[in-house]
From Swiss-Prot:
Residues 745-845 are annotated as: Mediates interaction with DZIP1. Residues 403-421, 703-726, 863-880, 1166-1175 have a biased composition (Low complexity). The gene is Gli3. The modification Omega-N-methylarginine is found at R175. A zinc finger (C2H2-type) spans 480-505, 513-540, 546-570, 576-601, 607-632. One of its GO terms (molecular function) is mediator complex binding. GO terms for cellular component: axoneme; cilium; cytoplasm; GLI-SUFU complex; nuclear speck; nucleolus; nucleoplasm; nucleus. This is Transcriptional activator GLI3. One of its GO terms (biological process) is regulation of smoothened signaling pathway.
Amino acid sequence: MEAQAHSSTATERKKAENSIGKCPTRTDVSEKAVASSTTSNEDESPGQIYHRERRNAITMQPQSVQGLNKISEEPSTSSDERASLIKKEIHGSLPHLAEPSLPYRGTVFAMDPRNGYMEPHYHPPHLFPAFHPPVPIDARHHEGRYHYDPSPIPPLHVPSALSSSPTYPDLPFIRISPHRNPTAASESPFSPPHPYINPYMDYIRSLHSSPSLSMISAARGLSPTDAPHAGVSPAEYYHQMALLTGQRSPYADILPSAATAGAGAIHMEYLHAMDSTRFPSPRLSARPSRKRTLSISPLSDHSFDLQTMIRTSPNSLVTILNNSRSSSSASGSYGHLSASAISPALSFTYPSAPVSLHMHQQILSRQQSLGSAFGHSPPLIHPAPTFPTQRPIPGIPTVLNPVQVSSGPSESSQSKPTSESAVSSTGDPMHNKRSKIKPDEDLPSPGSRGQQEQPEGTTLVKEEADKDESKQEPEVIYETNCHWEGCTREFDTQDQLVHHINNDHIHGEKKEFVCRWLDCSREQKPFKAQYMLVVHMRRHTGEKPHKCTFEGCTKAYSRLENLKTHLRSHTGEKPYVCEHEGCNKAFSNASDRAKHQNRTHSNEKPYVCKIPGCTKRYTDPSSLRKHVKTVHGPEAHVTKKQRGDMHPRPPPPRDSGSHSQSRSPGRPTQGAFGEQKELSNTTSKREECLQVKTVKAEKPMTSQPSPGGQSSCSSQQSPISNYSNSGLELPLTDGGSVADLSAIDETPIMDSTISTATTALALQARRNPAGTKWMEHIKLERLKQVNGMFPRLNPILPSKAPAVSPLIGNGTQSNNNYSSGGPGTLLPSRSDLSGVDFTVLNTLNRRDSNTSTISSAYLSSRRSSGISPCFSSRRSSEASQAEGRPQNVSVADSYDPISTDASRRSSEASQGDGLPSLLSLTPVQQYRLKAKYAAATGGPPPTPLPHMERLSLKTKMALLGEGRDSGVTLPPVHPPRRCSDGGGHTYRGRHLMPHDALANSVRRASDPVRTVSENMSLARVQRFSSLNSFNPPNLPPSVEKRSLVLQNYTRQESSQPRYFQASPCPPSITENVALEALTMDADANLNDEDLLPDDVVQYLNSQNQTGYGQQLQSGISEDSKVAHEPEDLDLAGLPDSHVGQEYPALEQPCSEGSKTDLPIQWNEVSSGTSDLSSSKLKCGQQRPSAQQPRGFGLYNNMVVHPHNLWKVGTGPAGGYQTLGENSSTYNGPEHFAIHSGDGLGTNGNTFHEQPFKTQQYGSQLNRQPLTSSALDHACGTGIQGSKLKGNSLQENGGLLDFSLSVAPNELAGNTVNGMQTQDQMGQGYIAHQLLSGSMQHQGPSRPGQQVLGQVGATSHINIYQGTESCLPGTQDNSSQPSSMAAIRGYQPCASYGGNRRQAMPRGNLTLQQGQLSDMSQSSRVNSIKMEAQGQSQQLCSTVQNYSGQFYDQTMGFSQQDRKAGSFSLSDANCLLQGNGTENSELLSPGANQVTSTVDSFESHDLEGVQIDFDAIIDDGDHTSLMSGALSPSIIQNLSHSSSRLTTPRASLPFPSLSMGTTNMAIGDMSSLLTSLAEESKFLAVMQ
């Protein structure tokens, strides 16, 4: 070492000598010599150089020279750097050297590691004691092994801790000390101490905001050795430090030049504070703005991964720092690093800053062992702020923590194993108690307020204090006058008041712990213990006896537990570890942990706003407090603290101008109905809570929605319930705080999850109350509007509300069902905000996807961008989409098989996009659905509907099925959002909504937002259409088709043909209900089929495998012309949700099947079964690309998807009938594959045959005998037209150039499992195209032939429209032209029931336009189990078997007619539905794709009747609906309605249906349904 030391360059020596003042006694030590010390463990140059390896720190013991100043500098070298030369300075000399470019590189001279000075270890400090090089921190510090030699003996034991910080190996211990510039050879290594090197300062500054330097603080020259010598007075020292401000050093701007001592303190503090920034060493973060000194928070540190830290170390980040938590107290939590880093020198034996010393001593006293550890070591004078530093500076104490470290071993022990660490030690007693705040407990949940009068709100203080300094505790109050009841004494000081209260009042009433303070929100509710009252009184007096002991930190708390929590912010201790398995996050307080757990691991929102009428719930108390404070006002916030208490009496009315004003004072507090403490301000506050929440209104009825409920701020009784509430008024003037909005949404449903705590808005709200008020006011207004729009609970719509028939849920919150259809004036911009936006769905108490958007109150959703006027939550995206589309106001929970009322999905579904003001379901329908569900599940029957009388006669008729022929048609209710969801329930005039055309389902948050074409948005006016409006505006044909028309319930209300064409989309629940009723009505002899839901029937059929004919519905209304559909609509562009939904699929008339044949609840097959076939897809949804044969480009080719194909080998035994009950012969091309190279109609309405690229089913099938697989391919080959323009097909049925190639033998040769592969879509569409609006609904028996077009390669297939008897269960091979198939683009597969399809002549397919061939097929439900996946698309309207009767809505065929067994073949031919629809509709499957999926015609028929559970079900969560009420249509809906559902989800256990999801509720549907069949029937009858 010595040799190396002497080997230093002459220049360095000279520099050293010069800077030292050339003191002869100074030992020359070369930098290198020192550098070697890093590697050397030896003490060399005995006498002169005491060199002890201390990893990076080498100090050479200078010969004591009085003349020499102690040079405080330790090499802060990076791990790879060598120790710098030790610098000496003569006491008086301050050589001004150029600032070293590398401040952290410096030379190290022998020095006392504790003070860094060369000579007397505790020599009077130099005026500008250079900051000694930081003592490196390493595991030893953390583990308490790092040990400073407490004695001042010359041979200081330099702890060998100078290794670079484990966490910051890259940071050479950057010394703050200005002295160093080893790199600048020309420059003296000794920089004047005062000039802090700019680079270094810059670095520090960056660190200040970024990673805490606490770990590094020691390395920074903050090492314990910095302490001035005892001889130096703190003031002098500070003064010296302060001088720095005058220096050019970067600190100049940091340190207040005004206060020298302060400056010095700040300087030190700055250093330490910054250090603490990252690791919560006791040092307080320099950052004053931080609500909670997240000293531990590495958030700012780019390189530091807080998550990782937390994950790796439940209690602290220290482990990350040194991989050791051995002494959590020592290294303990982040902050404990400081202890390790700081030398014992910290003990203030001398008059260091009194404050810091005092604090420190307190800490030491608390840290009993620590005190001893420090006691002997020379004090490190951390500049105690002589004046309050600009920000609380944990500074000295922070540094003091190192004291713990000081006694290495003792430190470990010292640092409380409790992991409280120094800070905890400071708050040791507190630490032990932490009493009130249960580590895990909700941290007194708002309701639970901590033992200590949480009600006061102080309970949360601790949490707040840490998090939000402003919130530390109740508003700062400094009361000097006694307002105790009957006492008016006044005092000069708060202390006197407190003393008075405690002695005269509290103790005077020993037996009674009641706060009698005037206006106390406790309302004299007694406390359980005196101490609680004492603590409570602090709220009134403002007393905060518990002060943070960290120097520079001025925080004080009225509750000790809050202080303890706060202290953790300094120490970084995180004793509260997430209890969730596998989650290692640790928190400093139970509150944070509870928040984390509630938000991250559950949907629970235990913190309920207790303000009367406010139903907001939060996952964490802080959010609740924030809500209360921002929305209800600071006073409310304080009172709110009472949250645990009985509803606190409304806080004294705040200024009317205050936040509360946003609420209309008069509004009843909806939260506690009985309790409505209508204090106007309280009410207003509640309103402020965000009536928006009302929108979400948990259940308006429920005053406090379950934690999972929308944390709707709206009064517990959702404001909406008060229809009368300001209606649409949107007084922006009210001061609602926006913050509240965020708060409202703040409690995110776990679903999303996540929820950000109160949004920034809330924060801003605090900052800008006026703005927040405005926002809040807007929110409230919107809510009011929404409320006004829809009676929440009030079954009777308030007069001012838009006329919406009240949904009377059986107990469901029907009112929620109402979506405000009216444009919320609130969001005028969102004129289209559908009821969905306001959907009462929220009443479900859960933020369902849709609801959440609403619950966000548009503005508040955390997720939502800022205050997006519409919906904040992720669902807002849905809402946004929804805005354009008619809202389905269906009952949120109207029908959720699994959870009738609760399911989020159901709520969403119910929320579905119904018509803006129309409920998808009438109460009756709801009732019926519920009844069915109850029957299926064995649950209690729903509550009778009280307001049937409210229904219009027509509606009643429709619902009751007073006569299919009555001519009464239910308005096409918009299905809940699902496929049904799509335009299905829209008015005909409405353009496709984006979700309709594009996704067919509301876009989920995860789904990219789809732009909506202008024409797609529903005119606002439409939104207001009342449920009673039976003549909805014309929808684009596609939409019309999609619109849920009672598919089997076709009544043309007026001469105008109903546009109720069997929509490709499955019927909505309403339709299903109506159909069900109609079916019963239509059939005098109600069959079980009639009574049972389609799903049930189909299920039964599938179980029995008895053929259950499906009815082809071809409802083509003149109105539904292609023209209606936006011609520019690019179906190809449509997402998986099928645009094709628009396209109705032909329904085949089904002969009645035995009860067993009945579908399992109408929709069941569709929901659970392979309804999935293209017919399922019929909504026009294209298969997911994966599913779709590539052969179908979008719309390019019709391809029969193999999965659509029927299973081979299934014979008629399955009871499946071939296409049409009567086998239809197909004489034409071997395969009927329609290749739509060209859009129909657009190019002459011809499909151009194109080879399938992916699977050339058509071409190859042509050659292939139809094996069942072939049938699978060939049959049901759908026509895929290129996207069809509205005009593409000529209504007169321009020639479609179908490339029909079906191997006759294939067709005839194989019967699929009774599953018909017909692609309804293809059928419906082709026929539709042919009929394309021109086709008139004509009796099924019409024999006219219509030339569909020339078959491309093949001769035209003439669809012979011979009459075909569709006998129930009849499986004739009657020559039924596979016109249906042809039309559908399916190869007509002869009856699958064992009958081979007979090849039809390729002659021109002719189908008389006016005439839809009604092909009855008694394919069994089992057969229906088509591969949903296989289906490229499901037609939204598939033929549905209803009661074994087929109704051709469009045709207007009566069931009896169809039953008549003999229809002309044309009748037998699949009816083209929605022929009027655009060509694109023809392509319903994927518009282009006609995938032949096994069309269970019965499913189609059923589908017409089917309840659109899918709509009810939220996207993707269809399975829940599957429980028993699933209807095939649902499955279909699933497939097409939900964008998610590229493949229909079938929960039902249909054998062929490969549904990944099975509905738990469904269980064994067959047995259940069988047992419940009668009950269902009964219920249906009752309905």
